[in-house]
Each structure stands twice: as structure tokens, then as C-alpha cells.
From Swiss-Prot:
PROSITE patterns: NGF_1, NGF_2. GO terms for cellular component: axon; dendrite; extracellular space; synaptic vesicle. This is Neurotrophic factor BDNF precursor form. BDNF promotes the survival of neuronal populations that are all located either in the central nervous system or directly connected to it. SUPFAM superfamilies: Cystine-knot cytokines (SSF57501). GO terms for molecular function: growth factor activity; nerve growth factor receptor binding. Glycans are attached at N143. Belongs to the NGF-beta family. Residues 19-150 form a propeptide. The gene is bdnf. It comes from Xiphophorus maculatus (Southern platyfish). Residues 1-18 form the signal peptide.
Length: 269
């Protein structure tokens, strides 16, 4: 009984200490290499069979809790160093905010939205989203029968736009100023600094056609009951601008994006 009791006590205290984590053969991956790297570099007992040390050099094995604490500490140190580097980059710019080049690199997705293009030459095609919409319509038409496809063609059905509009790419030379979201007039920068030089800003604007047939009113509206007018509407896009205080930055400005019909009911009839 005494021997059994001593065996149970030894087993109990042995379970209180956890062996260090090791990668199982054939199970190495990104998770084990990234998060268990600290366990591999943690001090191990030199008397283990894996190390080949002698019995007199045996040390205590680190517990599972100590191993994870070390991993967490290393992750926090890496995060702190990254934050410190980011603060140092901001201070090196004189505290005046990020430069246009840094902002352009960090927000390159925003620069190529549906109606803004940063390029060294005039774009030859409409924005990508417009082309994707046309391609989708082409795929929809390809799945139709020949008869249905003929009747779905707007020209065959006699469909006409209520208001005639024109769309074209313009630059800051054509659009020198604009209105931002705060209602202030800002100057549109013609060129955007990039690491390899400068690129121009292009805006894809859509407005009512002054030479169209709807300059005197919307098409298809009963003039006996309504007074109609085709008007150009605007939307906000992001562009590199300069305010009245000579501060350059990325702001949302208004550009022409569509031509719509406005109606007014004639009263007294």
C-alpha cells in the first residue's frame, strides 16, 4: 500500500508540470512555426533524450503556462515596435500630417474609384465599373434567344433617354476649382506626386448635352401639365486638392455625374 501511495503522489506532482511544446512529425505548418517558435527557443533540459546531454546536466522543463506567457510577451513587443515606428514616421514629417505621396500609397484603392483615375495619359476607355456593367449586359444578352435579343435592343424598341447627356474625361486644367464636403471652394491639383515622378488626375464627368434635343425640356413629358428641365447633378469623389490656407490633402469634391429630368406641375389649369 505504501508503494502504491508513493506512486500516486509522484504521478500527481508529475502532472502539475507540463512538457514543452514540440511539433509533431509531419504536422509542421505556419501556425506551429509562428506561435510555437518561442517554445523552440525556450530553455530546455539538457538531460532530455532529444538533446543528448548527460544526467548531471538535467534542468527543469518549462511549464505550458510559462511558454504561452513568453509567446504573448514577444507578440506585444513586436506590436509595440511597429507602433513606435509609425509614430516616428509621423514626427519626421514635421507634424503637418501625412504627405500626399504617403497618402497616395496607403489609399491607392481609393484613387481608382469609378470616376477618378490617376494616370500619365488620358484614359482611352470609360471607368472600369462602366465597362463591367456593359459586359454584364452583354452576357445577359448572350443567354437570350435571337428573337428575344432583337426585342431587347433599345434601338429596336425605340427607347430614348429622357435627357441627352455627354460623358468625358477632364483634368484640373478644365476643372480648376471645386466644392468640398464642407462647402468650401478648393483648388484641384493637376498632378499627384508619386515615388517615380508625377501623375495627372482625371475625372470622368457626365452632364447634360447643351447641343442635344432636350435643351428645351425633357423628352416624352406632357407639356400641357408639366414644365420639365434637364439638369446636371453632382456627386462626391476623392481628389488631391489645396484649400485657401495652402494646405494640400485628399478631400471629397463635387463633380458632374449625371443628367436628370426635373418636373414642375403647371397650376391653374
Amino acid at each position: 500500500m505504501t508503494i502504491l501511495f508513493l506512486t500516486m503522489v509522484i504521478s500527481y506532482f508529475s502532472c502539475m508540470r507540463a512538457a514543452p511544446l514540440r511539433d509533431a512529425p509531419g504536422m509542421r505548418g505556419h501556425w506551429t512555426e509562428g506561435y510555437l517558435g518561442a517554445a523552440a527557443t525556450a530553455p530546455r533540459g539538457h538531460g532530455t533524450p532529444q538533446s543528448g546531454g548527460g544526467p548531471g546536466q538535467r534542468e527543469e522543463l518549462p511549464s505550458l503556462t510559462d511558454t504561452f506567457e513568453q509567446v504573448i510577451e514577444e507578440l506585444l513587443e513586436v506590436e509595440g515596435e511597429a507602433a513606435h515606428v509609425g509614430q516616428g514616421a509621423d514626427k519626421s514629417q514635421g507634424g503637418g500630417g501625412p504627405s500626399p505621396v504617403a497618402t497616395a500609397e496607403a489609399n491607392d484603392v481609393d484613387l481608382y474609384n469609378s470616376r477618378v483615375m490617376i494616370s500619365n495619359q488620358v484614359p482611352l476607355e470609360p471607368p472600369l465599373l462602366f465597362l463591367l456593367e456593359e459586359y454584364k449586359n452583354y452576357l445577359d444578352a448572350a443567354n437570350m434567344s435571337m428573337r428575344v435579343r432583337r426585342h431587347s435592343d433599345p434601338s429596336r424598341r425605340g427607347e430614348l433617354s429622357v435627357c441627352d447627356s455627354i460623358s468625358q474625361w477632364v483634368t484640373a486644367v478644365d476643372k480648376k476649382t471645386a466644392i468640398d464636403m464642407s462647402g468650401q471652394t478648393v483648388t484641384v491639383m493637376e498632378k499627384v506626386p508619386v515615388p517615380n515622378g508625377q501623375l495627372k488626375q482625371y475625372f470622368y464627368e457626365t452632364k447634360c448635352n447643351p447641343m442635344g434635343y432636350t435643351k428645351d425640356g425633357c423628352r416624352g413629358i406632357d407639356k400641357r401639365h408639366y414644365t420639365s428641365q434637364c439638369r446636371t447633378t453632382q456627386s462626391y469623389v476623392r481628389a488631391l486638392t489645396m484649400d485657401s490656407k495652402k494646405k494640400i490633402g485628399w478631400r471629397f469634391i463635387r463633380i458632374d455625374t449625371s443628367c436628370v429630368c426635373t418636373l414642375t406641375i403647371k397650376r391653374g389649369r
